[in-house]
Regions:
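Terminal helices and disordered tails flanking the catalytic cores of nucleotide-processing hydrolases
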Residues: 1-8, 244, 249-279
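Conserved alpha-helical "signature site"
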Residues: 1-155, 167-242, 278
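A conserved active-site-flanking secondary-structure segment within enzyme catalytic domains
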Residues: 160
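Active-site-proximal region of nucleotide-activated glycan assembly enzymes
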Residues: 163
Length: 279
């Protein structure tokens, strides 16, 4: 039975659209506002949906903005780029007739990317460049499973809820493959960077990460924080907690996982997530 599901997932990966053009263009943008601001404006102006999304976000704050240039000024270069990436990726998978709220899934992914960037800026600046994208895409395998083996994936969510177990364990039991493995195969199909593929594959299994362990640890940490803060819903009903391996990795950045010590970081994340309507 597992073989049947894995074949179905494999077939779906082959038939999936290529990496969205906008996302591919955003991957190529370096994190230098001075050099890339004009390129970002051109990407947005060529896409009516991106333009509308940015303007709607600004105007929902009670500010009146009608132009892309002004919208980027208000949002900031990084947030504007992040919104474009999230929007372009979510359009690849149009989920219909599902009992699962796909928007909450995307909200969780967006939240993890946002928190990963915040943590990187505060504790490990070398990871800032990849932090948001890695966080945004870490659970992309769930979206593939939801779209192509939706009924079985919903059963995995129900099993996670019934047992209070990690969702990836329920996926393994029912499908023979977890969302990390599916996501990593999609990353290979789309020729995404190895660092992103490793995050997808190992964010629930840090000891297996070798080349990009710090980035995997960062996203794992951000994922747990978002689950604690109830930012979106990734369908995982296990009690969020920090493994010894993750605690060791975070200790290298002098991150104290005691609740009181984490409070300032949590408040910082809450403020940013609330600003983006992700809680």
């Amino acid at each position: 039975m597992h073989t049947e599901y894995i074949k179905k997932i494999t077939k779906s990966l082959i038939s999936l659209p290529t990496l969205p053009t906008v996302a591919a263009q955003l991957f190529e943008l370096i994190d230098d506002e001075k050099d890339q601001r004009e390129n970002l404006e051109q990407i947005i102006s060529a896409d009516p949906i991106l333009t509308a999304r940015l303007l709607r976000m600004i105007n929902s704050r009670g500010e009146s903005v009608t132009g892309i240039h002004s919208a980027i000024d208000k949002l900031g270069f990084e947030q504007a780029k992040e919104i474009c990436m999230e929007t372009s990726m979510s359009r690849v998978f149009e989920l219909k007739n599902s009992k699962v709220d796909s928007q909450k899934f995307w909200d969780h992914c967006y939240a993890v990317g946002t928190v990963a960037r915040i943590v990187a800026q505060k504790y490990e600046p070398n990871l800032v460049t990849d932090a948001f994208t890695a966080g945004l895409l870490h659970d992309l395998g769930k979206i593939v499973l939801l779209q192509y083996v939706g009924s079985e994936f919903e059963q995995a969510i129900a099993l996670s809820k019934e047992r209070s177990c990690e969702l990836y364990l329920a996926e393994k039991e029912l499908l023979g493959e977890d969302h990390g493995q599916t996501g990593a195969r999609l990353a290979e199909t789309w020729l995404l960077p190895r660092s992103i593929s490793e995050v997808m594959l190992y964010h629930h299994n840090l000891p297996r990460a070798e080349i990009n362990r710090p980035l995997v640890a960062l996203v794992s940490f951000a994922d747990i924080l978002c689950r604690i803060l109830k930012a979106g819903d990734g369908g995982n009903y296990a009690q969020p907690g920090f493994t010894p391996e993750l605690a060791d990795e975070l200790g290298k950045w002098n991150i104290n996982l005691e609740y009181k010590a984490l409070e300032p970081l949590m408040f910082l994340c809450i403020a940013e997530l609330d600003k983006r309507n992700l809680r």
